[in-house]
Regions:
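S-adenosyl-L-methionine
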Residues: 1-7
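Local beta-strand N-terminus motif with an aromatic residue
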Residues: 9-11, 38
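A short SAM/SAH-binding and catalytic strip from SAM-dependent methyltransferases
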Residues: 11-21
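C-terminal substrate-binding/active-site "lid" region of AdoMet-derived donor-dependent transferases
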Residues: 21-105
């Protein structure tokens, strides 16, 4: 991945696989190092934090353990990224609230 992306000026990474906090946090930590200032990581299905507890039956993720809680933990440690609320405002409806992460410095 590093070799493929080394000469790219803008990079957009989409995270939408396993939705547990632990998994998404690991993805954010791994892939964030490839993202340059002005580029984005989009974390999907952060709306899970807004759902009722036990809404997702037979799934390991739930309220309190999901992509949005991973984003919040990631941003506490990584000051290179911020939530871009402007995208969320333009879309009005999204499955990714707080999931549009803009890289603000290299």
């Amino acid at each position: 991945i590093k070799k493929i992306l080394k000469d790219k000026k803008k990079i957009m990474i989409f995270l939408d696989s396993n939705h547990t906090e632990q998994h998404v946090l690991a993805e954010l930590e791994k892939y964030s190092k490839f993202v340059k200032a002005g580029s984005y990581i989009i974390v999907f299905d952060t709306m899970m934090e807004d759902m009722k507890r036990h809404h997702f039956k037979a799934r390991p993720w739930d309220h309190g353990n999901n992509p949005r809680t991973a984003v919040w933990k990631f941003l506490k440690k990584n000051k290179r990224f911020k939530i871009d609320k402007e995208i969320q405002k333009k879309l009005l409806i999204t499955s990714c609230p707080d999931g549009y992460l803009k890289c603000i410095k290299n």
